[in-house]
Amino acid sequence: MHLLVDFGKIKKLIAELINASKAIKIDKEYLRRLDSSFESSYQYLFHAGFRSLRLYRISHAFYVSDFKFLAYLIYHINRILYTVDIHPAAVLEPGVVIDHGTGLVIGSTAVVGSGTVLYHGVTLGAKYITKGKRHPTVGRNVIVGAGAKVLGPVYIGDNAKIGANSVVISDVPKGATAVGIPARIVFKNSTESPKPHLFHSTIDKNDAGDELCHKKENNLKKVLM
């Protein structure tokens, strides 16, 4: 009797779900530190941005483990419940903060670094329909304001800020502020150091983020090949 069970895939799924659980713990730590309205641990139960991020992490675990149907099912549930559209193939480092979440769109080849805050209505999308890398790479400790659109395979440097409703179609340097349509650099400070409160914790978040994100990127490359 032939058993249609791929134990290798199941083993990989278990490992990815464990990674997702670790990432969610780091997400909680960042949310507590970065959301000024956060008052008590019970808010995790009602914070739509955090809950949608948690669903993304689960869908991503299924996606990179080649359980595509279940990955897209969870992705669709996320869209219905929270109006958040994060493709399960996207790579979000542990420690991303989604504030409100409503209308957020993140494409399949996008990468987002830890400490980054994404407000409602943000789009990390493509400029053209093409194969390969076509969505933004957002560094660490970036703020992307409400309604901002970052389009194409552009790079947003660490500690950068994108103004609300801006449309970014070119790279933004580290520490810079970009506003407008199309976005222009209005402030540039490449020597700006990371915000210290993001890194002083009992959890070594960036090391954990590096390890998990490298694994996810390697898995994603295999899936997209």
What are the roles of these predicted feature ranges?
Residues 132-151, 155, 181-225:
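C-terminal segments of enzyme domains that contribute to small-molecule binding surfaces
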